[in-house]
Amino acid sequence: MKIRAAIAGASGYVGGELARLLANHPNIELVTVTGNSSVGETLGSLNPALDKYSDLVFVENTKENLLGHDVVFLALPHTKSAEVATWLEDDVLVLDCGADFRLESAEEFEKFYKSPHAGSWTYGMPELLIEGNSKQREKLSGQKRIAVPGCNATAITLALAPLLRDGLVDPTDLVSTLSVGTSGAGRNAEVNQEPVLASAFAYQVGGIHRHIPEVQQNLQKSAKGQVSLTFTPVLVPMFRGILAVNTAKLLPGVDETAIRNAFTSVYGTESFIEILPSATFPNTSDVEFTNKVQIGIAIDEA
């Protein structure tokens, strides 16, 4: 018997991507899609490239429509998942793709999201370095409530965590500049597409981006000491993908061999993370529509 799945908020980009992934999963059957703005429309009307499940009809996002599934994906706007989560049975696997349950600190959540903190769920980044040489994967087994990591947070965390674990860089001088696709703003975002297609521009500059506390929370689990991050996202004329340029000051005596050894020891057996050869750097088109992450390494000798 297949696992019965529902997507709450399936009319957005995240919901559409979940439907695409589930369509190729041999053991899961998507049976319900909710979307209050699209009730009565078909999933295929918003996702023309979708073949399987294209005839599923959106229903209202209610408790009655979400009960009775084995797994429920919450693809709702930030701060909207907490209430919906209370509707669902304890034995149902619930994965929140929003930010409601990512942060452990209520103070940080309320500061960046301007909303009460609903608590934290098990963080869903299997490759994340935690205490000692352990990874978050060990904590995910058997969990019924999982917080899916943020996109920018994933790109920064995976790039910097091995360096911090091995004490190779100054943890108080981390800088991340991310070129991000327009889909990151969401389907209903008030983004004027004309200037986006003609230029690139920074947004949420000056330490106000909501992924900052999530990244710091992640990196603190690996770092030897406090972590300080400067993060600037730049919207560029591509639809999907992130190219993260992460820089950090090397500590004395650290060379490229030590850096490569750090990444290889952490990610060498990870199926979805590729450490690129020397002088080779990531290209978003190489990982588009995949689960893969590419990591390139360079030392500024100037």
Model-derived features: positions:
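Predominant activation on well-ordered alpha-helical scaffold segments within soluble catalytic domains
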Residues: 19, 157-161, 212-216, 260, ...
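Short Gly/Pro-enriched turn/cap motifs at secondary-structure boundaries
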Residues: 203-207, 234-237, 283-287
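C-terminal active-site/capping subdomain that shapes the small-molecule cofactor and substrate pocket
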Residues: 247-302
